[in-house]
Amino acid sequence: MPIRRLDPTTINRIAAGEVIERPAAAVKELVENALDAGARRIGVTIEGGGIGRIEVTDDGHGIPEAELPLAIERHATSKLTDEALVRIATLGFRGEALPSIGAAGRLTVTSRPAGQDSAARIVVDGGAVREVEPVAGPVGTCVTVEDLFHATPARRKFLRSAGSEAGSCADAVRHLALAAPAVGFSLTIDGAASFDLPPQDRRERVAAIYGRADAEKLLEIEAVREEVALRGFISPASLTRAAARHQHMVVNGRPVRDPLLRMALRLAYRERIPAGRHPLAALWLEIPAEMLDVNVHPAKAELRFATPDAVRSLMIGAVQRALATPADLAAAPSVSMPRTSWAASSPMPRYPQAESRAARGFAEAELRGLDLPPARVAPEVLPESRPDYPLGTPIAQVFDTYILAQSGDGTLVLVDQHAAHERLTEIRLRAERDSGAIPAQALLAPSVVELPAEDIARLLGAAERLAGLGLEIEAFGPGAVLVRAVPAALAKADPAALARDVADTLAESGTAMALEAKLDAVLIRMACHRSVRAGRRLAFAEMEALLRAMETTPLAQTCPHGRPTVLRLSRGDLERMFGRAG
């Protein structure tokens, strides 16, 4: 086939695929345009997950009638001059958003600047542009997108359900609302108001987005180094979520999901929170524009810093100083476990039920409630060593997290108590579910949990199936759900934290996944809630009970997330490590 130039329509549709890969991307681009136009109030309406209709209205400067045809041309912008590319101060600068949206759907732009007698409208349908026409309208701009991706039907095959796409749109608006707290924001999804925020300061906006109960627990941070300043709010190590979607980072007013910043936050919390948990964070970074390259990602979500090490160090130091305050010391572990390169042990063989009294107690009593008995502080006699115990007898507990045992052949065994108990809890919950339904424990005082509208929709949409897992949830007015019962095995769990984690799990799983598979992920999340935590001191009887139960549990060599629960060190391994082996 000979080389030929592509026609403009095909070029626009290819470019649209890079810029507008889903409805949330269109919402983000349109709201950024409104902010760049100096809007003090922005309204967003979503219908059908953003595939049916997106509307963004603002009271900004507006577009003159004569410039409307230019506004929907590719690489036409009022935000950039030739010499300003290295000092970008606006959210948008490429001139790609409107033409990309117009190439993918049906785009209508209605705008009126101050001083213009009436508004003007231009329509783009699948790349075809209609004539500008005068219409009535207030000062500002209204952009409507309908039937998104009708011109590129292949793109629709890769979209998730309308509810999930609406949730992603809402997340995008929330991130932008945090980036610009001085601007009022409203969001309506399928006719229902999701939120309506007046202009606020940062603290008020954080409380509106995260909920006042969580916002009151957040720690304020501030750090300045030369020309770089970091300010914001983070959660103590005792307040975490099941997903990282509650982390919002803003650089020079631009909401980003930059890997360097996210990694710095993760490193700051690394030895303070369990694996699989994520802190809450709302952070604003101010840095000279010439020290930042924002033109490195199609969605402008990632950045390139001139001094990445300095930025990383600033964030890690600021977060760790805040976490070291007296309010958070109780949640921080006193000793950290050094990293090793030991491989996980080979899969554990299945053994007959052990006859120890501790094992019977664990299997018959503790697995029923999935709660280890309180640790005793009185001196105890070590259990008698038995050569037929694959995991041996416990010798000690290391860092209040790992059980050290010795098997009959002299092998040292290390067991992660949380990961191991999590697997046992998960197996117990699965057995109850497969036998019909997981028993529910009604709460004496039902718990009211405030949540975003899209999380409420996810929970209520799966409410009937969640009831089969023992979690009974119902609507409770606007912006909240009522938790009436939790799985009996999780009777002591925090119902509000459980509901939030289940909502996060449903959101993170993606709605392309079958509900049954999602519920599997929910069940694993539930198991994590009731498992004995790292940092909990165990008595020898408790340690032995856990080891004996592991020996009779399938898949006990890994936790539900695939991490190892057991590591083994033979005498030969130790001799090689100490240089004794020939």
Swiss-Prot record:
InterPro entries reported in the protein's UniProt record: DNA_mismatch_repair_CS (IPR014762), DNA_mismatch_repair_MutL (IPR020667), DNA_mismatch_S5_2-like (IPR013507), HATPase_C_sf (IPR036890), MutL/Mlh/PMS (IPR002099), MutL/Mlh/Pms-like (IPR038973), MutL_C (IPR014790), MutL_C_dimsub (IPR042120)
Keywords per UniProt: DNA damage, DNA repair
PROSITE patterns according to UniProt: DNA_MISMATCH_REPAIR_1
Record-stated family: Belongs to the DNA mismatch repair MutL/HexB family.
GO CC terms: mismatch repair complex
Any single biological process term in GO: mismatch repair
SMART domains registered for this protein in UniProt: DNA_mis_repair (SM01340), MutL_C (SM00853)
HAMAP family listed in its UniProt record: DNA_mis_repair
Gene Ontology MF term list: ATP binding; ATP hydrolysis activity; ATP-dependent DNA damage sensor activity; mismatched DNA binding
Any Pfam family the entry gives: HATPase_c_3
Protein name: DNA mismatch repair protein MutL
Described function: This protein is involved in the repair of mismatches in DNA. It is required for dam-dependent methyl-directed DNA mismatch repair. May act as a 'molecular matchmaker', a protein that promotes the formation of a stable complex between two or more DNA-binding proteins in an ATP-dependent manner without itself being part of a final effector complex.
